[in-house]
């Protein structure tokens, strides 16, 4: 069979009524009972990942703070990316006891006390099983970790974990007051995920409680 319906254009998804996977299954009449994607890495891929990362005696923490397409107008999106002050605070807190590998493109913001890890996707995913802690945004890293059976802490801003996330994760929501909503620049979604600054609705740029994030990471 050929499946070509785009669930992103369905009313259920636009209204954020259910998880995206459930929306896709319902469009095709496929029963869904909560299955999650699974990724399989072969022994050679895992071996190459160890060769690339060269593990030492420190536990590894994986960190993804920014995402999005390389051509988006800004390298920082308020709608998806972790505020830089929060990200740096986490890096400072864990840098003395963890080797922090920062998943980012070369054109994305740089943090102190971390190592950038820039690898092809499959090689990067093979690094995930080497990690002890994982802190991500709503982007590809959280999905890769989930498909490998790994729990993560995920920070959410514009999108909702009930639509794009996983119950096994610790999902962190903004700890800020909404004071304004301006949706003029969005189409088919409440907020432009690339982060149109005119749409920023909160009363502060520091959207998360850093202690809440640290407390969830301690449980991993």
Q: Residue locations for each model-derived region?
A:
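Catalytic machinery of carbohydrate-active enzymes
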Residues: 1-220
């Amino acid at each position: 069979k050929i499946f070509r319906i785009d669930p992103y254009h369905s009313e259920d998804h636009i209204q954020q009524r259910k998880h995206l996977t459930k929306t896709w299954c319902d469009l095709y009449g496929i029963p869904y009972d909560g299955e999650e994607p699974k990724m399989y890495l072969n022994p050679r891929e895992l071996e190459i990942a160890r060769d690339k990362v060269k593990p030492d005696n420190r536990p590894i923490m994986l960190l993804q703070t920014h995402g999005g397409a390389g051509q988006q107008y800004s390298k920082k999106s308020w709608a998806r990316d972790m505020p830089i002050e929060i990200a740096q605070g986490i890096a400072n807190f864990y840098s003395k006891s963890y080797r922090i590998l920062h998943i980012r493109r070369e054109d994305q913001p740089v943090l102190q006390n971390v190592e950038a890890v820039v690898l092809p996707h499959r090689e990067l995913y093979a690094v995930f099983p080497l990690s002890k802690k994982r802190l991500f945004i709503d982007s590809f890293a959280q999905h890769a970790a989930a498909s490998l059976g790994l729990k993560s802490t995920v920070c959410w801003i514009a999108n909702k974990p009930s639509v794009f996330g996983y119950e096994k994760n610790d999902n962190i929501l903004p700890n800020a007051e909404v004071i304004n909503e301006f949706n003029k620049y969005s189409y088919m979604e409440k907020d432009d995920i690339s982060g149109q600054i005119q749409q920023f609705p909160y009363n502060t740029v520091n959207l998360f409680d850093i202690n809440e994030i640290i407390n969830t990471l301690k449980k991993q």
